[in-house]
Amino acid sequence: MTFRNCVAVDLGASSGRVMLARYERECRSLTLREIHRFNNGLHSQNGYVTWNVDRLESAIRLGLNKVCEEGIRIDSIGIDTWGVDFVLLDQQGQRVGLPVAYRDSRTNGLMAQAQQQLGKRDIYQRSGIQFLPFNTIYQLRALTEQQPELIPHIAHALLIPDYFSYRLTGKMNWEYTNATTTQLVNINSDDWDESLLAWSGANKAWFGRPTHPGNVIGHWICPQGNEIPVVAVASHDTASAVIASPLNGSRAAYLSSGTWSLMGFESQTPFTNDTALAANITNEGGAEGRYRVLKNIMGLWLLQRVLQERQINDLPALIAATQALPACRFIINPNDDRFINPDEMCSEIQAACRETAQPIPESDAELARCIFDSLALLYADVLHELAQLRGEDFSQLHIVGGGCQNALLNQLCADACGIRVIAGPVEASTLGNIGIQLMTLDELNNVDDFRQVVSTTANLTTFTPNPDSEIAHYVAQIHSTRQTKELCA
């Protein structure tokens, strides 16, 4: 038997994990084992919301060392994380300033300023990326305007996964899929857009040309002295998750469900027309030159904050209590900027309901019901937008990532969207990370080849839409009201 041992470092906004994958060539089987799991979260430092990258690096090294201590020969390592955030370095490779998180308020008002000065359509035509107030372009503008004293010291700007790869190897890399989240990469050249960079205030010399997934960045020297290749995987965690989504045919959509929910479809060409701009659709880079045409949805961040504020530890019990409540009594827009990082999420949700003359969710279960129903309805709206954009309906939706373990939300999504939902794999980002490593090691041919492996090894659960559910009736009522308004217009 021929085995490959690959390690995936998968960092999310709320947690990180070091996972060991064992691939058996002859039977094309893939097994995952969690080596080390650790918490991640936001910190307040010198007036900014930041990431503790030193603690994260220590946790990564601890996980890698644990694998080596077991006597396992690692064939390769890959790192994926969230997008848009970065670390600044000087000529000696030392950090400059703080690793500020995207939920910090320093970018307030800058997106509108960019649209006014550069033109919203021109920015979109250049980047193809959705307008979000925390995109890297606005973070860099905030940095250069608010902390000009740092500029003379900056030699390099590395996105988060590239920074950790640099810390392991001493080699710098700017991986393409994550680079596209910055709104600074030109969609036609796959290189940094000089006009957008100029507006951000950043120096182009801070960046190297983006590289597509599949190259070896450098080597990590393990405690036993072995040189282990560190591969540039699809380092944006959603890009990795999409690679591991067992999409079957052109009518399949995906939803990567976690702190963020990202819903979209794969395409060989980007969509940057006026319809896409009006819908605020993003065209993020994917593996093998594919585009991830998708939309960002605030996701389970709202629930995570409620769990924290209410000190709820038993999520299954909460979901069971939530399921017993009637649907669609409390509806909010999860994508409202007010929910990006409020002082108190529970109070913010209640205020949104109060301002729209709805009942106020008071109990833990009512708050969760509000979040689940609102997300499912937003999923239905976004799926409809995506279908209109490409001119073809979807036949199934693949929900991947940690959020796919929420059976209630999966069923609500199926009912609201009126579409078959296939949930799994849970560790999609980790699997996609491993997939690129196996391709780099010449064990697999391409993404489609890897998806066949995922389909036969992952635990998948199907949810069939129930047209008689409360949320399905609510959606039908909304559509009927919209059609009436359109006819009367």
From Swiss-Prot:
Cofactor(s) named in the record? Mg(2+)
Q: Which Pfam families match?
A: FGGY_C, FGGY_N
List the pathway annotation: Carbohydrate degradation; L-rhamnose degradation; glycerone phosphate from L-rhamnose: step 2/3
Q: Which GO terms describe its molecular function?
A: ATP binding; glycerol kinase activity; rhamnulokinase activity
Q: Which GO terms describe its biological process?
A: glycerol metabolic process; rhamnose catabolic process
Q: Which domain of life is it from?
A: Bacteria
Residues bound to ATP are 13-17, 259, 304, 402
Quote the catalytic residue positions: 237 (proton acceptor)
Q: Name one GO cellular component term.
A: cytosol
Binding-site residues for substrate, renumbered to this chain = 83, 236-238, 296
> What does it catalyze?
L-rhamnulose + ATP = L-rhamnulose 1-phosphate + ADP + H(+)
Xref: Gene3D superfamilies: 3.30.420.40
* Cysteine disulfide links: 68-222, 353-370, 413-417
Q: What is its EC number?
A: 2.7.1.5
Q: Which UniProt keywords apply?
A: ATP-binding, Disulfide bond, Kinase, Magnesium, Nucleotide-binding, Rhamnose metabolism, Transferase
User: Entry's NCBIfam families?
Assistant: PRK10640.1 (NF007925), rhamnulo_kin (TIGR02627)
Question: Do you know which HAMAP family this protein is assigned to?
Answer: Rhamnulokinase (MF_01535)
What the protein does comes down to: Involved in the catabolism of L-rhamnose (6-deoxy-L-mannose). Catalyzes the transfer of the gamma-phosphate group from ATP to the 1-hydroxyl group of L-rhamnulose to yield L-rhamnulose 1-phosphate.
- What family does the entry list? Belongs to the rhamnulokinase family.
Quaternary form?
Monomer.
* Name listed for the protein in its UniProt record: Rhamnulokinase
The gene it comes from is rhaB
